[in-house]
Every structure is written in C-alpha cells, then in structure tokens.
UniProtKB/Swiss-Prot annotation:
Organism the protein comes from: Borrelia turicatae
Assigned protein family: Belongs to the bacterial histone-like protein family.
Cellular component terms per the entry's GO annotation: cytosol
Alphabetical GO biological process terms: chromosome condensation
A single MF term (Gene Ontology): DNA binding
Family annotation (InterPro entries): Hist_DNA-bd, Histone-like_DNA-bd_CS, IHF-like_DNA-bd_dom_sf
Name of the protein in question: DNA-binding protein HBbu
Domain of life: Bacteria
Amino acid sequence: MSFSRRAKVTKSDIVNQISLNIKNSNEKLEKKYIRLVVDAFFEELKNSLCLNNVIEFRSFGTFELRKRKGRQNARNPQTGEYVNVDDHHVAYFRPGKDLKERVWGIKG
C-alpha cells in the first residue's frame, strides 16, 4: 500500500465515518450522539492519563505517562533564548502487535 500524500483526519471525520458505518449496518444513531460518545471517550482518556493510569486497548496499543527528565540550557526555537526545563510528564503511545503488523508495509 502506498500513499502520495498524508491526509489529516479530524474528530469530525471520525464521527462522520462512524455514522456511515452505523448506517451501513441498518442501525440509526444521530451524529450528535456519536459526537457525545467520541467526546466522552477522549475526555475519559485524558482523565485516566492525568491519574497516571495505563490505558490498554488490546491489539491497538497502550497509552501511558512517561517522566521526562528536566535539563538546563534547552533552547527556545522561536527566540533562541536558553531556558531551564523542569522534570515533566509526557503522554506516550505504544502500538500493539496488530497495529504494528497492519502498518508495517505502508510506504510513503
């Protein structure tokens, strides 16, 4: 599989695609309800990460917080000014086996 250009997929695109998938299954669910579920999902994901929980979706991947060590003399790329950066946490995603296998052969 090869791509000429990367497309950006937004939350609205995901809601629209879910809506199409539901319509194809002959079920009815309005987009506003799908959006509520998607919004609640992302909010819960953020809340769980803020509680330092590990969020695992089998075959898809795992979200977790990782501690990034602070450092001195980091450079602000916009101003060129040197600043100190404190220890902080960052969100990290580790893809699952099925996701890794699925995207392995993608070129471009």
